[in-house]
């Protein structure tokens, strides 16, 4: 039976929903306590779900064309669905210890060994808050040495508007043409090769790695083909078992501020999270971290460095940066910029571009090219200010407690003296949204009071569709459609704000933007936060308006 491309996603969705109903309605699956006592039950359920996902990933879409749109469609078919994620969470199984073995095997199948990636002279960065900004700062500094380093690769996640943002060269996302070219080179190599089913029983012919693993493979392939002289890699989640940890010999490693996030995968204590982050440390590659780490976390990081036979150095905020206007706003970015200085220094010294490393001292002298690199760093949706018509938008994709406090403090301090109306646009679909709103509220009060508060979904368009690059299958579609999270946020806000602000709920980002434009004739300051998906969707909406 031939399944057309247009009908395929609908059939998949229907099958998933029916499977979920069967499982959840079954008596054994409806009692959570039985998960803890019946190991066979847990294994059976996850295995069923695992096989089902293989059915989805096996030949996800047979592509007729090989355009950028075709590549995005194929890539989206590799996402894990919400029901499967929740099923695995219910088992309490945090670790996929096969990840790195699988990455080595996938790499072999596309023509590489892990040692091939050593030529990329990699900076490997992990952390909870600020690792993307630190990666951007580091890349921008290295980009000032174009004669010696003509091409600098940068791999980050997630993306805001286009998946191409994850794979950059000299600070710019690769073109749609190059993305499609390299994407299908990897895709076709995987199709034309096989794995030993004795060693990898789930790697059946036609199967593909998941979304993030595929993009990680694609980044290595792209940077090697483009002859990048140095690359900056941001960890996806954690470090120890992250797909990027196939990197065997980084030049230097960095750890930004630690906090509580991704607890299902990393653990719910700072110690557990630090242990995972420290998993990227490698023998012979010095490691640096920001100052003012949580003491318990710093202790674990030091232990991990000793275990991996390397050094860990705390980086103070450099005094020379105190009066420098960084390309990414926010006072807290000074520590990320300082860390980036040390990471770039290691790369440039190892490459014989700097005669001496920069001293890790607050009074150290920083070269002018480093300062220019920090000033010229561009990183959308992190403490970003945009003027649109009569309104000023303050945008930050904060989605953890610490980042929310930092972003909210930045907004408060920036608009404290402004007499404009204040509007909040917020969403967080998969974490504890109400806790984040409480962090936001306590950070801006009492200096800032919002006149209007809008809770929206991450759906891009009022037609109910997403921008193709922003399709996400890891949230509950039922919750999105019924606006469950948004209605809960309204109740919570009215309680903590004593019903002072007018609250609104919209089903899409486009509708939220249209509502904001009609609320007041006078100018307003608008704070957008809670989710990088929300921020990315808003920027896509802005782009369409600008084209019109």
From Swiss-Prot:
Enzyme Commission code(s) on record: 6.3.2.17
InterPro entries (alphabetical): Folylpolyglutamate_synth, Folylpolyglutamate_synth_CS, Folylpolyglutamate_synth_euk, Mur-like_cat_sf, Mur_ligase_C_dom_sf
Pathway annotation: Cofactor biosynthesis; tetrahydrofolylpolyglutamate biosynthesis
One GO cellular component term: mitochondrial inner membrane
Gene Ontology biological process terms from the UniProt entry: one-carbon metabolic process
Record localization: Mitochondrion inner membrane; Mitochondrion matrix; Cytoplasm
GO MF, any single term: metal ion binding
Cofactor: record remark: A monovalent cation.
Binding site for ATP: 130-133, 382, 396
Record: residues binding Mg(2+) 2: 262
Cofactor: a monovalent cation
Catalytic reactions of this protein: (6S)-5,6,7,8-tetrahydrofolyl-(gamma-L-Glu)(n) + L-glutamate + ATP = (6S)-5,6,7,8-tetrahydrofolyl-(gamma-L-Glu)(n+1) + ADP + phosphate + H(+)
Cross-referenced PROSITE patterns: FOLYLPOLYGLU_SYNT_1 (PS01011), FOLYLPOLYGLU_SYNT_2 (PS01012)
Main location: mitochondrion
Protein purpose: Catalyzes conversion of folates to polyglutamate derivatives allowing concentration of folate compounds in the cell and the intracellular retention of these cofactors, which are important substrates for most of the folate-dependent enzymes that are involved in one-carbon transfer reactions involved in purine, pyrimidine and amino acid synthesis. Required for methionine synthesis and maintenance of intact mitochondrial DNA. Involved in telomere maintenance.
Membership in a protein family: Belongs to the folylpolyglutamate synthase family.
Protein known as: Folylpolyglutamate synthase
Protein's organism: Saccharomyces cerevisiae (strain FostersB) (Baker's yeast)
